């Protein structure tokens, strides 16, 4: 029993989003981009901070210029854009806008991005979990449909490509998504769009109950700045802007995103390198005895090793200097630089000998 009687009892069992348990020389656990911004970009941003951003003034609360820049990049209109302190804030706002007051729960197909369930639970929103196919990690559409019949689902949460497994939605899954009733909000999380190059954005006009989430933390290398954006129906974006906390993005973060979009071609050129490294890692992992690795459309690979407890393998790898993430009963390895990937493979071979 909790000594703090004012606390909600259900929150006592809520586990926070966890990262790698200890520092590692090579951080391949968080799906970050392995290359920092070019020095010239960072110097320009530093100069902006020094000369152009008054510390005593609040930042732009409405993100007007940023919405225009993002809309131009994404192929949308500014009124279709809402910005958050990372996609996490947007997810939380979407759940507040749809599910609070006993209006329904969310459907998640696991394994998937854990923050959907964590944020829903923190708000007292029911979470209905449906397991994915254990071989392909495809959605079990029959069980998803059963969940819709048996529970008052208000939001369906889909990550495309999925994290941690890396697979994109299939044609059959898209057909199911397109058939969902308009009273159900469909969150299509495209955090890894720049790697997969697949987007549902062209179909948004046909589906006012769809909303796309993206982030600048991955391919644009701005994880430290925590900026995500939603693309959807203007009325939904207006509600999200009303729900979010005021001044949710720092002035420096807004300038960083503006710079990233101005130099998008240069920054995104290195995505090709990551995809090439991903395929090389995939082939190398396939050749190791006992390793089952799944193909990926993102900047990470998901795998399991026969005869090994994945958490024990994570710890052994960590001790040798490579941080990986344990999730969903397996390990997720972020694609790093060629040197980081080489060291990761060497260390794994050493462990498996």
Swiss-Prot record:
Report any one BP term from Gene Ontology.
Answer: L-histidine biosynthetic process
Q: Which residues carry this modification: N6-(pyridoxal phosphate)lysine?
A: 218
The UniProt catalytic activity note for this protein reads: L-histidinol phosphate + 2-oxoglutarate = 3-(imidazol-4-yl)-2-oxopropyl phosphate + L-glutamate
Note the Pfam families from the entry: Aminotran_1_2
Q: Which SUPFAM superfamilies match?
A: PLP-dependent transferases
Q: Does the keyword NADP apply?
A: no
Q: EC number(s) of the enzyme?
A: 2.6.1.9
Q: Does the keyword Amino-acid biosynthesis apply?
A: yes
The metabolic or biological pathway listed in the UniProt record of this protein is: Amino-acid biosynthesis; L-histidine biosynthesis; L-histidine from 5-phospho-alpha-D-ribose 1-diphosphate: step 7/9
Q: Indicate the enzyme's highest-level EC class.
A: transferase
Q: Which InterPro entries match?
A: Aminotransferase_I/II_large, HisP_aminotrans, HistidinolP_aminotransfase, PyrdxlP-dep_Trfase, PyrdxlP-dep_Trfase_major, PyrdxlP-dep_Trfase_small
Which controlled-vocabulary keywords does the entry list? Amino-acid biosynthesis, Aminotransferase, Histidine biosynthesis, Pyridoxal phosphate, Transferase
Q: Which PANTHER family match?
A: HISTIDINOL-PHOSPHATE AMINOTRANSFERASE, HISTIDINOL-PHOSPHATE AMINOTRANSFERASE 2
What family, per the record?
Answer: Belongs to the class-II pyridoxal-phosphate-dependent aminotransferase family. Histidinol-phosphate aminotransferase subfamily.
Q: What is this protein called?
A: Histidinol-phosphate aminotransferase
Q: Which organism is it from?
A: Synechococcus sp. (strain JA-2-3B'a(2-13))
- The encoding gene is hisC
């Amino acid at each position: 029993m909790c000594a703090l009687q004012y606390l909600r009892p259900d929150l006592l069992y809520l586990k926070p989003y966890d990262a790698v348990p200890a520092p590692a020389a090579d951080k391949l656990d968080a799906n970050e981009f392995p290359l920092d911004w070019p020095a010239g970009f960072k110097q320009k941003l530093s100069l902006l901070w020094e000369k152009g951003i008054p510390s005593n003034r609040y930042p732009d609360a409405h993100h007007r210029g940023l919405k225009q820049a993002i809309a131009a990049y994404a192929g949308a209109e500014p009124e279709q854009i809402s910005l958050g302190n990372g996609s996490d804030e947007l997810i939380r706002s979407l759940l507040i806008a749809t599910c609070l007051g006993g209006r329904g729960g969310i459907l998640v197909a696991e394994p998937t991005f854990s923050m959907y369930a964590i944020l829903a639970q923190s708000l007292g929103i029911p979470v209905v979990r449906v397991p994915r196919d254990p071989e392909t990690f495809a959605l079990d559409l029959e069980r998803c449909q059963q969940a819709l019949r048996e529970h008052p689902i208000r939001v369906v949460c889909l990550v495309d490509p999925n994290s941690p497994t890396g697979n994109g939605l299939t044609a059959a899954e898209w057909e199911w998504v397109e058939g969902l009733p308009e009273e159900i909000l469909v969150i299509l999380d495209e955090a890894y769009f720049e790697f997969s190059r697949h987007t549902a954005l062209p179909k948004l006009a046909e589906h006012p109950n769809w909303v796309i989430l993206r982030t600048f933390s991955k391919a644009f290398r701005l994880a430290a700045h925590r900026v995500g954006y939603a693309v959807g129906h203007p009325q939904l974006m207006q509600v999200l802007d009303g729900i979010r906390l005021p001044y949710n993005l720092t002035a420096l973060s807004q300038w960083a995103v503006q710079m990233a979009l101005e130099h998008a071609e240069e920054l995104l050129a290195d995505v090709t390198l990551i995809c090439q490294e991903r395929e090389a890692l995939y082939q190398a992992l396939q050749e190791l005895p006992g390793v089952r690795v799944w193909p990926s459309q993102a900047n990470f690979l998901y795998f399991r090793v026969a005869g090994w407890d994945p958490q024990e393998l994570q710890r052994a790898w960590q001790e040798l200097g490579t941080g990986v993430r344990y999730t969903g009963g397996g390990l997720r390895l972020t694609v790093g630089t060629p040197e980081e990937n080489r060291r990761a493979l060497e260390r794994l071979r050493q462990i498996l000998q």
